[in-house]
Amino acid sequence: MTRMVAYIISVILLLAVMAGGCRKKLADLYYDPDQTVQPSIEKFFTQMLNNDRVRPSYWNVRTFVVMHTGIYTQLTGYLNNTTAYQQNASYTQDRWNDFYRPGTAADGGNGGIMAHYRLIESLYGSIQDDQQKTNATVFLMAAKVVMFDQASQIVDLWGDIPFSEAGSVNTSGDIVAANFENAANVYDAILDGLKNAALYFSSAQLPTSVHASFSKQDILLNGQFDKWQRYANSIRLRLLMRLSFVNEEKAKTEVLNILNNPAVFPLADGGANYVPLSTDILLQPLTTYVDDLHLALTEVFNYSAPDYMLNTVMKPVNDPRIPALFDKYGRTDGDQFIPNTDYNGLPVSFNAEQQQVNLGRYAILDSATFLFNSKLPGIVITASEVNFLKAEAWERWGGGDAKAAYETAIRQSITFYYYLNSLNTSTRMPLTQPAAAAIDTFLQSDQIKYTGTANQKLAKNWVQKWVHFGFLQSVQGWAEYRRTKNPALQFYPSTLPGYELPPSRLVYPSSETSYNANYASVKDKDMRTGKIFWDVK
């Protein structure tokens, strides 16, 4: 693939110039036009936010989501080819690269969360004037939140990762083969960092001109300190719940402290005032973006409605989200199009040939909401997820109304997907939000109603959160599926030896196995059947 060739070339160039040229090249990309001799922390910060691994870009969806996490979670439809569960080494190398280093000029220099963060650290450390340093702190703290959020996802995909030493060439100028750090320790560092960042934003005060500069460069939250605080606290809640089966005492103590002190630890939970655009943490597309996902989802036949989600979870309860998520579709017979009369997901029990010849008989992802929607935002975290997390915590440990949080999460999920549908006004008129009575009836159906044993209620919560994630958040969906073992998915076994079923982690890319001498410390556990530290259920 062209991006892999570009990567190989970039590695060669990196080895040639790493002693000094790498940092200079990055800095040259983002000179402040008002200060022609100093690279700009502000511009590096904006570049951290401008992330096509957060936005639903063609490349991320086509090469990572629909070939990896979407399949491993059954959040996308897919063909049961023999290689369906085999990791694509080139594409997962790309995913790794896009965290650790910026892209080439050919792909817009996108990505490089860790590299840009280290440059911000370095520039911040070089500031001598106390007032200037105080003013620059807001960019450093926001950059920390973004880096911690993205680093947690790399841990969730691979496990132990280079972290505290990663990108050190951009701070010290020294070439260091970064050690692989224990995943649990990385999580601890992330959790502490998120807490400190949230507390900073709770009381930060800046001169008007500095706040205006931050707002201008902040293409994620437009300089709103309250939302940065909620963002950091919400990601912290997500990660604490993720480790709650391996370190329940820590998770319980810290989560209940968050939930019992909403004035100190506000969350992006929305409550009765939920409006997706203003409540959720969403990365909007650039104003120049005109692409959509129809090629990413159709090139390898990933547009069919997932079997378990539609047939087992949603149809039996007449889920109000169905019209926003799916089209009934149809098939062509001669020159006549025969529309399907109902929503049905493509059976996962079919072999690949049966699936392909029958695609037209089954529902597909909604064309207005997903296939041809150029306005889809990148989803960082939503109020619905936050309330599902609150419901789980209160169900397991008490202290709040788990039922109310669960029902709020589902209501917000319905609103969210109709919001996504409403963003596309070019292919058809937006759908009307379901009536309140229809949603109330849905919430009282046996499969959805918050009744049963504690384990049954937790399972309902986890399944509904899985539905809410969908393919757009399949990285989170895969993490939660492995953590909770819900829903109870069945996979069509592949005949390819060693790849009969989906993996429980990604194996490390060749950039680490071939060029990082410290890979030896993790080599023995670098197996697709290995487990991330929180995967103990």
Residue ranges and their predicted role:
Residues 218, 251-390, 395-464, 468, ...:
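Hydrophobic-face positions in mid-chain alpha helices that act as interaction patches
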Residues 1-31:
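Bacterial Sec-dependent N-terminal signal peptides
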Residues 22-80, 111, 125-130, 489-537:
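Membrane-proximal, proline-rich intrinsically disordered regions
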